[in-house]
Each structure stands twice: as C-alpha cells, then as structure tokens.
Amino acid sequence: MAFWQPSQRLYLPPTPVTKVLCSEQYIRRKDVFYHGETERMLTVGHPYYEIKQSGSGKTIPKVSPNQYRVFRILLPDPNQFALPDKAMYDPSKERLVWAVVGVQVSRGQPLGGSVSGHSYQNTLIDAENVSKKVNAQGTDDRKQGGMDVKQQQILLLGCTPAIGEYWTTARPCVTDRPETGSCPPIELKNKPIEDGDMMDIGFGAANFKELNATKSDLPLDIAKDICLYPDYLKMTEEAAGNSMFFFARKEQVYVRHIWSRGGTDKEMPPEAYFLKPKGGDQTQKMPSILFGVPSGSLVSTDGQLFNRPYWLFRAQGMNNGICWLNQLFVTVGDNTRGTTLTITVPTSGSPLTEYDTSKFNVFQRHVEEYKLAFVFQLCSVTLSPETVSHLQGLMPSILEHWDINMQPPTSSILEDTYRYLESPATKCADNVTPMGPEDPYAGLKFWEVNLKERLSLDLDQFPLGRRFLAQQGLGCSTRKRVAPVPKVTEKRIVRKRRKGN
C-alpha cells in the first residue's frame, strides 16, 4: 500500500533530556534513627522598623510578624560520629549522610491578628462610598490608615535556602530614551529567602525601595523593604530538588476597603470611556488609580500548620530528604500570632493622680517563640564511579566536603620548583594561605541552630520520637510475656499385692 508524504517536511527526534538520578538510587538507608531538637528560641523587637539608640549605640531589631524566619540547622558529620556499630559501613568505599524523615515546628504565644499601617498614607478618598464628591486634589491629602494584613502560614524544608520572587525596576532599552517621570519597565527577579525578609501582606511581591517613591503608598513595615513570595514554580522544577523537599502553606485575604491614590495620573482613561462634564474644565481631575485594602479576617486554631509533625516519605523532587553538607534549612512564615504589645511608661518618677497624655511614653514590641524537632535517618553512599560522577555534576561541594578530589587535567605549562626554600640564596616562598572550604551562604542572613551535640538515639524520650515510633508500630516500651509454667502432675504407682502373701 502506498502513502503520500510531503517531501519538504523533516521531523527530527526531540532532544534527549539530561536525566537526574533520584537519591534513592544511590542511597542505602540504615535502620538507625536519631532525634534532635532545639531549646525554646525567643526574639523581641519593634514590629515596624529598626531603631538605633543614639546614647548607647545599641540597636533594637525589627521583629515583625510578617517576616520570614529561616533556620539553618547545622548537623554533625556522621563520618566522624560515634556510631553504635563500627561495622555499619566501610569508610574506604562509603560515606555517611543524614536523611530527614520527620520535622515539627512548634510555636508559642496566643493567636492574634497582624496589624499594620502608616501615619501618612497616600489615601485620597474612600472610593467604595460615593456620598461625597471631591473635585480636586490638595497639596497633601495623606491620612492615617491601618489594616489587618493578609493572613499567611508557610513552611518550607530543604537542604539549600528557599528561593523567593519579586518585581523590581528594569533597565530600559537604549533606543527607548524614557522621559523623566515616566513609568519604568519592571522585571521578575529571584533571591534566596533570608531570615528577616518580608512576606507579601496583600500589596504584591515587589522591591518597594524602588517602586515606592512617595514613602506613603504602603504600610510602615514594608515601605522600604522587598516583599518576597516563594517561587514554588522554580523550586518545583529544580533538577536537584534541594531547595524544597516539601512545603505547606495557607493564605487568606479579602478586600476590606477600596481607596484611591493621590497624585498625577499619567495614564488617564481614554475619552471614549466616559462623557465629559458639561461646562467648566474638560479634563478629568481625579485619578483613576484604585487599590484594595487587604484583611486577613478570622484567626483560629482550626487551620494551623504548626505544632504538628510532618513525615517525609517521598519528596516532591529528586532529593528525597538527604541533608547534603550536613545542614538543613527550615523557612517559616506565620503572622497568625501577630499581637503587638503596647508598653506605656511615665515620664517622671512621681505618682500620677490625673490622666495626662503628655506624661506617658508609649512603646511597641513584638515577641516570637519557636521550637524545632527533627528525626534523622542514617544513610550511606557507595563511592562508585557513577555516583561520584553524578554528585560532581549535581553539587561539587559534596565531594570537596568528603575530601574527594577529581583527577585534574595534565598541565602543559612547565612550572618551576625550588629546593632549599628557607635558604637566603633562594627567593622567598609565596605567602599563599591554604584555602579552606568556603561557606556558600556566607553573605546571607539565617538563624543558625547548632544540633551537633544535641542528637540522641533514645527516641522514646522525646515527644516527636514517640510519635515516630508509633508510626512504625512500636511503643515507648515493650513488655515480654512470661511463658506459662506447665504443671507437672505426679503419677501415683499402685502396686498390687500378690495372693498368698
């Protein structure tokens, strides 16, 4: 049978995709589990901005309920660990690594809404209530505004920092030549989420250092900051799967008010969209820029993501919970405990009999309370050529941490080697300090938690450990049944007397 085919079309096979091995293909899990937990971790600061005291030179940090808390968990090197069984692995052919199988992030303090605002907010009119007509703007129409911000709970777990996304100004093309005062182009950028970075609270994920020129468009806690939103799309598509083993989130928001911005609107609606007023000025005076005031609404214990365990059986990426470089990153965002403490102090030491506002100093503080607990499983990696080659392409710092060097290429340059370097007749040796392993996150800010001396094999002595044992069908203690002792019955021997005796 003959078929007709167009001769001008040629379909090539698709380009093969570079395959990344799942960690379970070269990881051997041991039946050894360790429990590690932190102490109660507390932080206190101002909820909106950092304060530098002029007299003492000390700084009151910014501790906002709308900030991320990123914990960098430092684990001991299992290859230098005192293991219960020395025959567990062969150091010449294997390396030991940690795998996280359970995590619980516990939070203290009562629930409370997160309140923010600005004393001079760029709010022209209340656009949802049309009871009053405003014909013109003044020089300064700013007002005091407050709100309960978007409600968020975020929990991210990985062995590298989580990645956030935000919008910021971009460089215009050379041929555009934008005018002064025109709207700049914007672009989407990424950065690692650090401890203290701001979450999106209902006004978008953007660099407000560049986009908020009035310093009045946003609440005080984000007016000069970058609001980040976790880039779930990028972390999900990451080949290695290191930045996000799993995540849990809850977002809740509704528009409580609709206000308009003050300023000169350079992008007015076209004339075809409205009829001009009869008589008077034919130009539209009021701007058409509206924005919604967010509200996080009810805060309750029904939808809490914290104070409960999470068990990792299968990660969303190719890394199934392996803690490369003996570290773990826990990214937490939670503003459901956003209560701000108001502290009033009298200005004088004499007792007061009448209320006078001028005789009191008012301060604000926000407090946070955390406690982390983990269950780790001991694993081994066989140093086969395939595994070493895969790890070299995936994360070369792993092999450097294990003191495994790849064979360097043969140099074609003739180098000089001097003898008697300490002799006055020979040139001075190069003062080169041997470089140690560099910290790839040296310039980033994290809340470091050292668990190198806080691991224990006694899982039944800790709440998370007992829950893990219950998941495995084991209890905190086992009682051996006593086998019943069989009763020994003595047989009575009855002798018959012979007749005649």
Swiss-Prot record:
Record's keyword annotation contains Disulfide bond: yes
Subcellular location: Virion; Host nucleus
InterPro entries, alphabetized: Capsid_L1_Papillomavir (IPR002210), Capsid_L1_sf_Papillomavir (IPR036973), dsDNA_vir_gr_I_capsid (IPR011222)
GO process annotations (BP): endocytosis involved in viral entry into host cell; virion attachment to host cell
Record-linked SUPFAM superfamilies: Group I dsDNA viruses
One GO CC term, this protein: T=7 icosahedral viral capsid
GO molecular function: structural molecule activity
Signal peptide: none
Pfam family, one: Late_protein_L1
Keywords for this protein: Capsid protein, Disulfide bond, Host nucleus, Host-virus interaction, Late protein, T=7 icosahedral capsid protein, Viral attachment to host cell, Viral penetration into host cytoplasm, Virion, Virus endocytosis by host, Virus entry into host cell
Domain of life: Viruses
Keyword Disulfide bond in annotation: yes
Function noted in UniProt: Forms an icosahedral capsid with a T=7 symmetry and a 50 nm diameter. The capsid is composed of 72 pentamers linked to each other by disulfide bonds and associated with L2 proteins. Binds to heparan sulfate proteoglycans on cell surface of basal layer keratinocytes to provide initial virion attachment. This binding mediates a conformational change in the virus capsid that facilitates efficient infection. The virion enters the host cell via endocytosis. During virus trafficking, L1 protein dissociates from the viral DNA and the genomic DNA is released to the host nucleus.
Family: Belongs to the papillomaviridae L1 protein family.
Oligomeric form and interacting partners: Self-assembles into homopentamers. The capsid has an icosahedral symmetry and consists of 72 capsomers, with each capsomer being a pentamer of L1. Interacts with the minor capsid protein L2; this interaction is necessary for viral genome encapsidation. Interacts with protein E2; this interaction enhances E2-dependent replication and transcription activation.
Name the record gives this protein: Major capsid protein L1
Source organism per UniProt: European elk papillomavirus (EEPV)
Gene that this polypeptide is encoded by: L1
